Amino acid sequence: IENIWYIFFCLADSTFSSVYVSYGKKGPYMLSGETMMSICKTLETIDFCCYRDAYSDAYNLLRKCRDDLMQYLFVLNVIQNKHGLTDEEAEKFTINSESMMKMIELDVSILVSGERKTDAELAMEKWIYNVLERSENKEDIKKFFDTSKYKSYLVSNNEKVKYIFDNFLVDKWLREDRKLNNYVHANGIRFVMDNYIYQNKKEDKDKELIETLQ
């Protein structure tokens, strides 16, 4: 777990130095390394659960790690594909400071208005602005904010992600998704009893959890 923690710690450092910015009706917003730092803390808690033989809790937190990472990838892809000024519109501006400022102002005004934004962009902004939880936004949650929805969006809108899923992750995703759901919903008494296993099974449970985490 420590080695995996270091990977996410490095990712957090990288994402804090690679900030993605966009604009909405409530002003500018950005995506940085917040999710990666949160995942690092969750991994520390998973490590503690394993130390205390609380594997049912560890798998529940492992599900949280998976969901948080998928949500981050969803939000990142939406921001990277924001619908502001088109390439054709940008080409009409000349390369001088005054023209560049006008181009930036037009791009920001289009983003703030939201007139070209997709439903995914508008829903993502509600998440950024911390208003997604409100009852009037329940359809956005239903349509976009679920791990299966994140996966569907990413596979449909990012060719690299689609290639990775189709060629390397299909079987593992189905297998591990089923396992994590079983622990979260306690689909059998053994998923509850894994919170107090016998010591002679600890090594096997550690190995199994690491394989799922990887």
What are these regions (language model features)?
Residues T35-L43, I197-Q199:
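Active-site-adjacent bridging/hinge elements
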Residues I1-T35:
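N-terminal, Lys/Arg-enriched amphipathic/low-complexity engagement segments
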Residues Y20-M30, D47, Y51-R52, N60-R178, ...:
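Short non-catalytic regulatory patches outside canonical folded cores
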Residues T15, Y72, Y183, N187-F191:
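A short secondary-structure junction motif
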Residues E159, Y163, G188-E211:
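C-terminal/domain-terminus segments
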Residues V170-K179, K201-Q214:
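Amphipathic, Lys/Arg-enriched alpha-helical patches that create a basic surface
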